[in-house]
Structures are given as C-alpha cells and as structure tokens.
Design a protein with these regions (language model features):
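C-terminal alpha-helical interaction module
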Residues: 1-319
Length: 319
C-alpha cells in the first residue's frame, strides 16, 4: 500500500496508481430539439482554463469551427485555489465571470447539485437560460460543437468525418489512456511500480505515433481531425511540463522528428497559437501541484521555436 501523499487522494488506488474521476454532468445540446438544450446562438457559455489540456481541446474546436460569437467563453485564474478550486478574477489572460458573477467555478457545480463532492473541473458548458451546467465532459463538448452546432459554425471544417469515425474512436481511446491521461498516471503515481507502468506506456504510444506520422501529415491523412487536437494538447505541454514535472523523461517531443514537426504544423494553423498560453500552463502545474513541486518554483524554459518551418506539406495527400 502506498503511504505517499497523493495529489487527489479520492482518485488514488492502494497500489499507488491514479484513476481519474468520471465526469459528473453529461447532458447534451441537440440540433433536433430532442433535449432541453436546443442549439441557440448566445445561449451557452464555456468556462475554461488555458492551463488545462482537457479544456484546451474545447477552446481549439470552438476556434476552428468559428463558434466564438455563438458560444461565449470565460477563462479562470490558472492558479487553482487549494480550498475552493478554480477561481475567476482579473489578471493576465483571465477575467471575472460576466454571466453569473461567480467567484469560484464551484458555484456553477452547486447550482446543479448542492451535494456534489467531486473535484471541480474544467471545461464547463453552461446554459444561461436554465442556469445549469449542461456538461463538464470535454469529450462531449467537443463532439457537440462538431456535430450539433454546425448551423452556427462559419467555417467548413469536418473534425469528425464519417468515413473515419470508427478508427477515430479507437485511436482516441488509445491516446487518452496512454498519453493524455497517461502523463497524469505517471505524474500522480505514488508508487514506483505505478509510475513506471504509466510512463513506459506513454512512450510506447509516442513511439508508435512517431512511426505513423512518418508518411502521413496528420493522423488520418491530409487534414487534421479531432484526434489530432486531442493529441496536440498533450504534446504542446509535454516538454514544458510533463517531461520534468510528471517525470515522463525518456525523451522530449523535440527528440521525435516527426512528432515535433507535426506539433509545429498544428500550432501554425491559423487561430491555434493564440489558444496556447505557456505562462498559464507552467504556473498552474508547477504552482498548484505542491505535493509534486513543494517549492512552487516555476521553470524558465524550455525554449521552443514552434513557428519554425515544419516541412510536413510534402506528406499531404487526399483523405
């Protein structure tokens, strides 16, 4: 049994492994009106953290589909309060809550369930009409934006193409279990065995993705789909945070020629770069996770030229 202090004790198993809590609120906005949440411009509001990879997915999809005027968004303070969780405020890159005047995101959770005792997480899709959370599932929010909000989108992008949906789901699950959540399973492990098991799985999958990207510009061909963005949010944080802070240090993403070129390629797609805030990312992880980093010192690096030429245009081909 592990006796080491866990970052989130309720999500820690006796063998030292971290097992993430399930999303608590999973209602759906439907274009066909089959739920209490129809697609209406201006009705829904997205609460996010620029530090959080799960929230970052929804920010990117909202941006790529041109939903900014249809779905409002408010960013929380990257430094999560130890007692109350995510906090609104006035600072660089974050702001007060303009919808409800909440001080803490917990207040949104309390509006749905005053007895909720789980961890307060982002993203949150809020319904301004019923004054309730529709969803705190990044998976579902992404998919709603992709499939239900199409009438409000001003950009012709298909991030969930029908011919690849089965393959997308399979690769999504692999990337989630071994990379997206895998870095957390390594970083939040409280036993050597649990850490090594998770860390090796991270690099097994990164190695496989490096090979896959040798002859394919994106994971499914010439155009990026939702799986690429699910992977991107971990890759963009990897060398700055997960390599050192979470001890996933066999290799950096910069050491993978294909993955690093792919990362730069995605980063350079119009609209994506401004969704990335390394100040928020580093301050959140290194300051908030004081069980891992008790000094709360935030590192100054790494230096990454994400705007450098990537050369991956040569791999473009028809999907």
């Amino acid at each position: 049994m592990s006796t080491v202090q866990a970052q989130f004790p309720d999500e820690q198993h006796d063998d030292g492994s971290f097992v993430r809590q399930q999303d608590a609120f999973r209602d759906w906005v439907r274009a066909d009106g089959s739920t209490p949440y129809p697609v209406v411009a201006g009705r829904y509001h997205l609460y996010v953290s620029l530090a959080c990879p799960w929230a970052h997915r929804t920010i990117i999809v909202r941006e790529l589909l041109g939903l900014q005027s249809a779905v409002g968004m408010t960013v929380v303070n990257p430094i999560r309060d130890d007692e109350h969780g995510w906090e609104f405020g006035d600072g660089p890159g974050f702001s007060p809550d303009p919808i409800n005047g909440f001080r803490y995101l917990r207040e949104a959770y309390d509006a749905n369930d005053p007895h909720y005792r789980g961890r307060i997480t982002v993203p949150v899709l809020w319904d301004t009409q019923s004054e309730r959370i529709v969803s705190n599932s990044d998976d579902d929010i992404m998919r709603m934006f992709e499939t239900e909000f199409t009438a409000l989108s001003n950009r012709a992008r298909d991030l969930y193409p029908a011919p690849f949906r089965d393959e997308i789901e399979r690769l999504n699950e692999t990337i989630y279990a071994t990379v997206n959540d895998g870095v957390y399973r390594a970083g939040f492990a409280t036993s050597q065995a649990a850490y090594e098991r998770a860390a090796y799985r991270v690099f097994d999958t990164l190695d496989a993705l490096e090979a896959r990207l040798a002859d394919s510009r994106y994971l499914f061909g010439a155009l990026p789909v939702e799986t690429d963005w699910r992977l991107f949010v971990t890759l963009i944080r990897f060398d700055a945070v997960y390599f050192g802070h979470f001890k996933c240090n066999l290799r950096r993403i910069a050491d993978y020629p294909n993955l690093f070129g792919y990362l730069r390629d995605l980063y350079q797609i119009p609209g994506v770069a401004h969704t990335v805030n390394f100040d928020h990312i580093k301050r959140h992880y290194y300051y908030t996770h004081d069980d891992i980093n008790p000094t709360r010192i935030v590192p100054i690096g790494p230096l990454q030229d994400l705007g450098a030429p990537h050369g991956r245009e040569r791999l473009s081909r028809s999907v």
